[in-house]
UniProtKB/Swiss-Prot annotation:
<dbReference type="Pfam" id="PF00828">
    <property type="entry name" value="Ribosomal_L27A"/>
</dbReference>
<dbReference type="InterPro" id="IPR021131">
    <property type="entry name" value="Ribosomal_uL15/eL18"/>
</dbReference>
<dbReference type="GO" id="GO:0019843">
    <property type="term" value="F:rRNA binding"/>
</dbReference>
<dbReference type="InterPro" id="IPR030878">
    <property type="entry name" value="Ribosomal_uL15"/>
</dbReference>
<protein>
    <recommendedName>
        <fullName>Large ribosomal subunit protein uL15</fullName>
    </recommendedName>
</protein>
<comment type="function">
    <text>Binds to the 23S rRNA.</text>
</comment>
<feature type="compositionally biased region" description="Basic and acidic residues">
    <location>
        <begin position="1"/>
        <end position="11"/>
    </location>
</feature>
<feature type="compositionally biased region" description="Gly residues">
    <location>
        <begin position="21"/>
        <end position="35"/>
    </location>
</feature>
<dbReference type="GO" id="GO:0003735">
    <property type="term" value="F:structural constituent of ribosome"/>
</dbReference>
<keyword id="KW-0687">Ribonucleoprotein</keyword>
<keyword id="KW-0694">RNA-binding</keyword>
<dbReference type="GO" id="GO:0006412">
    <property type="term" value="P:translation"/>
</dbReference>
<feature type="region of interest" description="Disordered">
    <location>
        <begin position="1"/>
        <end position="44"/>
    </location>
</feature>
<keyword id="KW-0689">Ribosomal protein</keyword>
<dbReference type="InterPro" id="IPR001196">
    <property type="entry name" value="Ribosomal_uL15_CS"/>
</dbReference>
<keyword id="KW-0699">rRNA-binding</keyword>
<comment type="subunit">
    <text>Part of the 50S ribosomal subunit.</text>
</comment>
Length: 156
């Protein structure tokens, strides 16, 4: 059997029914839409309109707000950092920070800083200078013999 011999099973793929193409086709004239009215016409449905019933977006109350001072961090796991070190993309002897992670291709776009999470294992002794880290990540870094420098009140 060759790739060019492969065929779909008969009846498994139905041809698309073209509507509104003459009465002989069975779906000509009104094309399965019935007769007249808003639903028979094209492009006239009103988004969110529920036929006069109070729409869901007005029945439910407004909630929350967008904090314009919120910081967005690049989240990186210890496993990804170890993989970059093993691949030779990241130097374990140099300080690991936002710039070095970006240069190594671990993160794509730099945001307000890097936050390290404890997923995976860290075997290398690494010095970090980052915006945040989880408690478990700090423990794993110190257990591996590394150090971590965080801004005040960033370790949570």
């Amino acid at each position: 059997m060759k790739l060019n011999d492969l065929r779909d099973k008969p009846g498994s793929v139905k041809a698309r029914k073209r509507v509104g193409r003459g009465i002989g086709s069975g779906t000509g004239k009104t094309g399965g839409r019935g007769v007249k009215g808003q639903k028979s016409r094209s492009g006239v449905s009103i988004n969110g309109f529920e036929g006069g019933q109070m729409p869901i977006y007005r029945r439910l109350p407004k909630r929350g707000f967008t904090n314009i001072f919120a910081k967005s961090f690049n989240v990186v796991s210890l496993g990804r950092i170890q993989a970059a070190i093993d691949a030779g993309k990241l130097d374990a002897k140099a300080v690991v920070n936002l710039d070095s992670l970006k240069a190594a291709g671990v993160i794509r776009r730099a945001k307000d800083g890097v936050r390290i999470l404890s997923d995976g294992e860290l075997k290398a002794k690494v010095a970090f200078e980052v915006a945040g880290a989880s408690k478990a990540a700090v423990e794993k870094i110190e257990k591996a013999g590394g150090s971590i420098k965080l801004p005040e009140a960033a370790a949570e």
